[in-house]
Amino acid sequence: MSAQIVPAPEHVCYVHCNFCNTIFAVSVPSNSMLNIVTVRCGHCTSLLSVNLRGLVQALPAEDHLQDNLKMHNMSFRENYSEYGSSSRYGRVPMMFSKNDTEHMLHVRPPEKRQRVPSAYNRFIKEEIRRIKANNPDISHREAFSTAAKNWAHFPNIHFGLGSHESSKKLDEAIGAPSPQKVQRLY
C-alpha cells in the first residue's frame, strides 16, 4: 500500500491589524498563496491588503497554533488587478510568524473624542445637584424624575434662561408691540 500525500487545502497566516493592534489568523486557500489578498479585521472591520508571495516559506507548519488563537470573524477576498484598487500599494502588509509576535510593540488604538454634553444632559446634572442640595434625603431616581419633569414643564430652560430671566424676557415679549410688516423695494 502506498500512502498518498495530499497537499493541505489551506494555510494559516498571521496578520497584524495596524489600526486596532490585533493579530488574527487567516485561513488562506493553497491556490491563493501567490496572490495579494484582502482581509477584513473582525475587531475593527478595517481592510488590510496582504502580499503572500514571499511568505510561502515563512508560514508556520504547526496546525495546533490555530487552535490556540482566538479567531476573529473576518472575510477573505482575492485582490486582482481588474478591481483597480490603488490603495493596495499604499498599505504595508504585515504577516508574523510565532517568533515575530513576541517582538511587537504595544500600540494603543486612537482614543475617541470626548463629546460635549447636550443642553438636556447639562440641565439634568445641575438640576439633580440643586434638588439634592435642597433635600439630601431624596433618592437619585426621584431627583432625576423631578429634574426630567422640570425640563419638560419649563420650555424656557431649554434655551439656557433661568426662571427669573425667562419671566423678564416673557414680559418684554408680551408687552412689546408686534413688528409691522413693511415692504421695501431694494
UniProtKB/Swiss-Prot annotation:
Distribution of this protein across tissues and organs: Expressed in leaf blades, leaf sheaths and flowers.
PANTHER family, A to Z: PROTEIN YABBY 2, PROTEIN YABBY 6-RELATED
A cellular-component GO term for this protein: nucleus
Species this protein is from: Oryza sativa subsp. japonica
Any one Gene Ontology molecular-function term assigned to this protein's record: zinc ion binding
Protein name: Protein YABBY 2
Family statement drawn from the similarity comment of this UniProt entry: Belongs to the YABBY family.
Zn finger intervals (C4-type): 17-44
Keyword Amino-acid biosynthesis (UniProt): no
Keywords: Metal-binding, Nucleus, Zinc, Zinc-finger
